[in-house]
Amino acid sequence: MNPGRPVPPPLAKTISLDTAGSEPSTGVLAAAYGATSPMSGLVPLTVARREPGEDDVEIAIEFCGLCHSDVHATRGEWRQPPYPLVPGHEIVGSVTRVGSAVEDFAVGDRVGVGCMVDSCRECDSCLEGLEQYCERGNVGTYGAADPRHEDAVTQGGYSTAVVVDKRFVLRVPGNLDPAAAAPLLCAGITTYSPLRYFDVEEGDSVGVVGLGGLGHMAVKLAKAMGAEVTVFTTSESKFDAARELGADHVVLSKDADAMEAANRSIDVIIDTVAAPHDLNPYFRTLRLDGALFQLGLPADDMPPVSPGLLIRRRLAYAGSLIGGIEETQEMLDFCAEHGVASDVEIVGAGQLNEAYDRMVAGDVKYRFVLDTATLQEPSERADA
């Protein structure tokens, strides 16, 4: 446990999301866990989901992955969010109701919802299937104003039910374990998208910086694409774990000689580290026309990159943000075909605050997943 984390209020206290800006109260009441302030920790809540419209899919949530961004969001570390806030954007469950205009989903289907639940649907990015880069801003799965529903604040997947527009619902293949599939909707697509953008295939060499929730998925996906994979880590204790995941090589990145030995050996690097670190040694491991994709989002500035390194080898330095809906479905189908899933530890609602502390401490292999069956029943309040 992190002794610096504020002590939350008693978990027996249930708070209803009946404040201005919460979702309309005409639909199902869902039990949930969320934060009521930066200092509250996660506590039981009751959230009122909207009544499904003609394009909506109502989902009984079975599992929801815990993402490190959930910690930042609920604790107000990136910005002051609208409280109460129910996090969770790695949702897997079963369809319970569909709107009259929904044809692709039926009651009982296993489905998923990722990091966004809507976009403008009209800009060039949206029309190209890149909703994550919507020029007007996509609607996040939690903590975002939903302009198509009276600017109601979206509430996430640490709950028993959710209602989502059909365009942002994904089909989860039946041969994927539902708990292990949940993190694919964030960690999976976040690493799959840059690998696909670079057209990684058999014979390519992929470097993965960091071996956490994102890094372990990058290793698995790159191997499934036929690549030779090198893991860069600052910790010798992760060597065996990297090899167990399928890495062909493991390099201790703080060892200058080991990094020099890897010079010009990599085609593309997936950097998952969210703390400031010097990228120049990694650029030196890239071959001509190589690329480094930055996925981690450090809170502080990174050391400067040497332009000469980029120029002399025609290297690219790029970022990447999750993936569009079509590509996310492609990723799920790819994982089902190749037997790829996240390594997960399932937790109950009463373990969520401890799980957050363990995430901050890096004490998880490799993703936590909430079993929503452990959430308490919602309060019987028509106005919640």
Q: Language-model segments: which ranges?
A:
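C-terminal hydrophobic helical "lid"/dimerization subdomain
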Residues: 2-5, 11-28, 236, 325-384
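NAD(P)H dinucleotide-binding glycine-rich loop of Rossmann-like/cofactor-binding domains
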Residues: 120-209
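Glycine-rich beta-strand-centered segment in the early N-terminal region that forms part
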Residues: 50-64, 77-127, 132, 155, ...
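Short N-terminal strand-loop motif that marks the start
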Residues: 1-92, 156, 160-164, 372-384
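Adenosine-nucleotide cofactor-binding segment
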Residues: 202-211, 216, 221-281
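Conserved beta-strand positions in the Rossmann-like core of class I SAM-dependent methyltransferases
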Residues: 96, 230, 293
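Glycine-rich phosphate-binding loop and adjacent beta-alpha segment
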Residues: 276-349, 372-384
